[in-house]
Regions:
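Transmembrane beta-barrel strands of outer-membrane/channel proteins
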Residues: 33-41, 77-85, 120-126, 162-168, ...
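Sequence/structural signature of outer-membrane beta-barrel proteins
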Residues: 38-44, 63, 84-92, 126-133, ...
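Outer-membrane beta-barrel "beta-signal"
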Residues: 52-54, 180-193
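Helix-adjacent hinge/juxtasegments
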Residues: 86-88, 92-117
Length: 193
């Protein structure tokens, strides 16, 4: 049921965004891009993740961008693919594996126009993993992610950022086994505008 609701919500968001953008005569434009690297751990099983996350930040439709800009908030729709090495040396069956994922429904809010700026990010994505030991039910998993951090403007148009994220990964009920894995991440990266 959660899977069906997520699909319907995603379709509604895409159709609504496209309709509003077309009505305003606007097009989506890239406002920033960047790359992040870091690691994470599942506190209960000690599974470790080491990942690289490139991303692009696209403008929202004009009225949403205008509203957020008015309050000193840069609101972006992020598309973030990632690849990760996964190490599980703490269980009875030691495993090395990988993840390949894509966060498509992701929002990034950057507050203020100072040299040091706070930001928050949240969204949904999908991941393919070969992590077999955890009996995840399927290799295709869905992710819910939330995080925040600070970015420091090194020079105009370029910032370095430090952030923390929490991610829940599960198969959304597509299989009888659906234990899910929660991960706490730390990431450092560069952002270009």
């Amino acid at each position: 049921m959660r899977f069906a609701r997520s699909i319907l919500l995603a379709m509604f968001a895409i159709v609504t965004s496209a309709t509003l953008a077309r009505a305003e005569g606007s097009c989506i434009e890239m406002r920033e891009w960047g790359v992040r690297a870091g690691g994470g751990i599942n506190p209960s099983s000690q599974i470790q993740y080491y990942a690289i996350h490139p991303y692009v930040g696209l403008s929202l439709w004009k009225s949403a961008s205008r509203w957020s800009d008015q309050y000193g908030i840069r609101a972006l729709w992020m598309i973030e693919p990632w690849v990760a090495y996964v190490n599980d040396d703490h269980g009875p069956q030691k495993t090395d594996s990988f993840e390949i994922g894509l966060n498509l429904l992701f929002i990034r809010l950057v507050f203020g126009d100072w040299v040091v700026r706070p930001f928050v990010e949240a969204g949904e994505g999908a991941v393919y993993t070969d992590l077999r030991k955890q009996d995840l039910g399927t290799r295709l998993q869905f992710t819910s992610t939330i995080g925040g951090g600070l970015e420091y403007e090194i020079q105009p148009g370029m910032s370095v950022g430090l952030q923390a994220r929490f991610r829940h990964m599960s198969n959304a009920g597509m299989a009888s086994s659906n234990p899910g894995i929660n991960t706490v991440f730390g990431l450092v990266g560069l952002t270009f505008r």
